[in-house]
From Swiss-Prot:
InterPro entries: Adenylosuccin_syn_GTP-bd, Adenylosuccin_syn_Lys_AS, Adenylosuccinate_synth_dom1, Adenylosuccinate_synth_dom2, Adenylosuccinate_synth_dom3, Adenylosuccinate_synthetase, P-loop_NTPase. GTP binds at residues 12-18, 40-42, 303, 329-331, 411-413. The lineage of its organism: Bacteria, Pseudomonadati, Pseudomonadota, Alphaproteobacteria, Rickettsiales. It comes from Wolbachia sp. subsp. Drosophila simulans (strain wRi). The active site is at 13 (proton acceptor), 41 (proton donor). Homodimer. Substrate binds at residues 297-303. This is Adenylosuccinate synthetase. The gene is purA.
Length: 425
């Protein structure tokens, strides 16, 4: 099991960062393969809280290699700022333990401008983006006009590519009576950061293939969650990249078999707009929000909260070929008398055992629940299966039966050490 892919199976915020950090103790390399600094991974080490956006979670472990793959939309200024903030805390990030793909498309100020502009134009139909410029950056990548990290080394090439990029963006800005951008402004923006960021530039695909031949253990760290996937998520309320496990190949350049682990919360949360069948707009939702401290790591927005959706997670398991589940934030459910799990949907007299693709149907689905008795016992910080209440064990067994794959690990607090291994991988 030299290669592991770790992905979220809900709408993100499942606790992937902690799990990657935990498993990376026995790995050599951790790779980010999609998304951008719209992702937020929170890790607690010795009571110190680290909030990572672009950097792989292994950056907190000495001796590990962290890699940002070509599938990541790269905000160079944000990355350098994140590196410098970690150095202040004593974390060593250097050109030997962090490598960035030379093919990464760069997020520029024009991308952030465009995202905000179109979100404002959408009015009441906003997607609810983080306004980090990720979507417009991916649009330019697909449109073959993106500035990539490798372009910064060649002034002539950079100038040509900037002309192409700004012809497109300024045409849109003129049409919307928005001030055009001068090339000199973008050049200055790039030149401010180019020397620092180019120091990390590497042919990541080649390095990963060489590391694999050496027998190194590699973890691929997903961002967001399965139902934010541009193809398989609750479209159009999705992110702009593929978040399922298969993207690990495309977004890194390493084609190899891997063991796939899915991370889920013991309940469900979602940031921003979009369908959410098990959302609880009541005391249950308020309790989950308060106890779970459900504020977005990046956006600081309140996360919507609801019961665990086994239909959704089972579908995500199948989309990513998941072999194993890690269950997080079980301790948030400690005080509940009764806990519900969604086992199916009802819409217009028809039963569904999957999430239909139609947005109009998704928003009208009526969840069907199975109830489980709560355990009414403090489980926060538990580290052995023998200390767990019987009703919590029954809840886990119920989830396994509904999802169709085993739960191997559970997390009982944000701290690195508070993990219980239920079964061997």
């Amino acid at each position: 099991m030299n290669n592991i892919v770790i992905v979220g199976l809900q709408w993100g915020d499942e606790g992937k960062g902690k799990i990657v950090d935990y498993l990376s103790e026995n790995a050599d390399v951790v790779v980010r393969f999609q998304g951008g600094n719209n992702a937020g991974h929170t890790i607690v080490v010795d009571d110190e809280v680290y909030k990572l956006n672009l950097l792989p979670s292994a950056v907190l472990r000495p001796g590990k290699i962290s890699i940002i793959g070509n599938g990541v939309a790269l905000d160079s200024h944000a990355l350098i700022s994140e590196i410098e903030s970690l150095k202040v805390k004593g974390v060593d990030v250097n050109y030997n333990n962090l490598m960035v793909s030379e093919s990464c498309p760069l997020i520029l100020s024009v991308h952030k401008d465009k995202e905000k502009l179109f979100e404002d134009l959408n009015g009441n139909h906003k997607i609810g983006t983080t306004n980090k410029g990720i979507g417009p950056c991916y649009e330019d990548k697909v449109g073959r006009r993106a500035i990539r990290l490798c372009d910064l080394e060649n002034a002539d090439e950079l100038n040509k590519r900037l002309d192409t990029l700004l012809n497109y963006h300024n045409a849109i800005r003129k049409g919307l009576n928005y001030q055009v951008v001068k090339k000199e402004e973008i050049l200055k923006e790039i030149q401010e950061i180019s020397e620092k960021i180019l120091s990390y530039k590497k042919p990541v695909w080649k390095i990963l293939n060489d590391l694999m031949k050496e027998g190194k253990k590699i973890i691929f760290e997903g961002a967001q969650g399965a139902f934010l996937d541009i193809d398989h998520g609750t479209y159009p309320f999705v992110t702009s990249s593929n978040t399922v496990a298969s993207q690990a190949i495309t977004g890194s350049g390493l084609s190899s078999n891997a063991y796939i682990i899915g991370v889920v919360k013991a309940y469900t949360t979602r940031v921003g707009n979009g369908p959410f069948p098990t959302e609880q707009k009541n005391e249950v939702g308020d309790s989950l929000f308060t106890i779970g401290k459900e504020l977005g790591t990046v956006s600081n927005r309140r996360r919507r909260c609801g019961w665990f959706d086994a239909v959704l997670v089972r579908q995500a398991v199948q989309l990513s070929g998941v072999s194993s589940i890690v269950l997080t934030k079980l301790d948030v459910l400690n005080s509940f008398d009764t806990i519900k799990i969604c086992t199916g949907y009802k819409y217009s007299g028809k039963m569904y055992d999957y999430l239909p693709a139609s947005h109009s149907i998704q928003g009208e689905l009526e969840p069907i629940y199975e109830e489980f008795p709560g355990w009414k016992e403090n489980t926060q910080g538990k580290r052995s299966i023998e200390t767990l209440p019987i009703n919590l064990i029954k809840y886990i067994e119920g989830l396994e039966k509904l999802i169709g794959v085993p739960i191997h690990l559970i997390s009982t607090s944000p701290k690195r050490e508070d993990v219980i291994k239920l079964k061997d991988f």
